Amino acid sequence: MNQNKMLELINHLKNAGFVFQGSEIYGGVANTWDYGPLGVLLKDNILNYWKKFFVFSQNNIYMLDSKILLNSKVWEASGHVGNFNDPLIENKINNKRYRADKVIEELFPNENVAKMTHEQMQEFLQKNVTSYDNSKCAWSEIKKFNLMFETFQGVVDDKKKAIYLRPETAQGIFINFKNIQRAMRAKLPFGVAQVGKSFRNEVTPGNFIFRTREFEQMELEFFFDEETPNSYFDELVNKSYDFMLKLGLSKNNLKVRKHDQEELAHYSKATVDLEYNFPFGWGELMGIAHRGNFDLSTHSKFSNEKLEYLDPNTNKKLIPSVIEPSVGLDRLMLAILCEAYSEEKVSESDTRLVLKLDKKLSPYKVAILPLIKKFNPKANEIYSYLIDKNISVTFDESASIGKRYRRQDAIGTYYCLTVDEQSLEDNTVTLRDRDSMQQERINFKDILKFL
């Protein structure tokens, strides 16, 4: 998919009810997007499969729902207050601000920006970038720009009352480690999974829903004893890659990239990114980080609470290490949509737009199409039957049957059931497959075998 197709996809997603510009009637807010009716269904299907794949498939993974607002000391302890920042630079000619590292990466993709200090970035830009973003350049000094959104609790605007919108969901898991382990009588190794909103005041958000200031994360923190021989890190990298394939992403559009030492976050011992080939280039889709015992050790120190684990077999106390597979739900959804968006030539004079979503992800698994209104009562009977079976189904009675097929193809509906005269006689319907467009006659209750 190229950039032009990307623009076509965005326009289609808006028209079809997947994604809308946030606050659109007031001129919008940059890089905010609302999920429409079909976007909500698709997002929920991705989320539910993530839970099935990473959580419910094992008996030692537990769910948590921690809050967006945490005690500010959490972020001081985690290092986010001191370390969670971007190198911000201003072009004094056009008065625009940019992330210095991203400007260099964009213009000089072979430069290893991760190894550069802020001073080296600034010197590099002043020497090599004399024009950018349709303007001549006079670069300011680089400043550290903290990515956390700050607000105040209570009625007094007092720095002592400062509180932050969380920039990641992980810390809510770490500070609840003791509660979860005790309540669930969990033995190492075990994991805690969480889904929730996070907020980062990004300097240069963009590329549709790939990078936004408000986003949703799906994270798993897998706790284990570092001294016990294991291959958990490699296993979770492989499991994460398999997860992407099962969502319908192509191997040709995926790559595994290990972070260099200079790239590692302050908490990380090792990190691997799964990257996807988006229309705008390769971008991180999922990160698997070996965080060691940094988080639990740091929170133990700052809170004076011992976040330890007592091994029931050896009576040994230890602070567990953790491996974290983390994925942004919004950018994963974008990758899936880029992969699925297709225009097919059906004949010399006819093309169709189709979202070839994996069956488990389709917003609607089935569309009920009465051939004419006379058949609506029977169609409603079939609709109610499938709803009772917890099947995601839609009802479409307007326009010709051909136009309705195309409409359902364009939103990813996997099967269409056409109700006609014969349906009234023997309960059969015409089943049409989205991808092959093949049709066959079945009893309407047999659709369950296809799902």
Swiss-Prot record:
- Cell compartment(s), UniProt: Cytoplasm
Q: According to its UniProt record, where is this protein mainly located?
A: cytoplasm
Q: Name one GO molecular function term.
A: ATP binding
What InterPro entries would the database entry show? aa-tRNA-synt_IIb, aa-tRNA-synth_II, aa-tRNA-synth_II/BPL/LPL, Anticodon-bd, Anticodon-bd_dom_sf, Gly-tRNA_synthase/POLG2, Gly_tRNA_ligase_bac, GlyRS-like_core
Catalytic function, reaction form: tRNA(Gly) + glycine + ATP = glycyl-tRNA(Gly) + AMP + diphosphate
This protein's assembly is summarised as: Homodimer.
The protein depicted here goes by the name Glycine--tRNA ligase
Organism of provenance? Mycoplasmopsis synoviae (strain 53)
Could you tell me the gene encoding this protein? glyQS
